Amino acid sequence: MARINESERGATPFQHLLGHNQEVMNRWNDLGSMLAEEGRLSSRLKEQVRRTLAQGNGCEYCKAKGKPEPHLFDEKTSISVGFADVFLKVKGDIPDSILKVLKETFSDEEISELCAFIAFTTASQYFGAMMGLKA
């Protein structure tokens, strides 16, 4: 059971917790949906990054959606997942050498999208962890 009562708003247990504030839930959902869809980076790549982050961000609900699937990785996915692993260890203090590796494969637009996705996904997973959200 979560640490607070679920609201009646939302379609998922996560949304039920955010649903205590309808506007926050709606905007959170909109941003999450936009970041997860196809953009400069594929939704498949982002799902593998999300799964990687879930293993380190403490949200049991998020972990239950699956571990990364290395057999599905292409080069960009491998680099993105590696970057997410570095982020989990050092948080925002990413060394320039790591960004240099990203710049060898990704455009500035792709790096911006990847970092935004990682930051938003981490915030979502931290919220789930703080609320004690279970699978």
PLM region spans:
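Hydrophobic alpha-helical segments
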Residues: 1-135
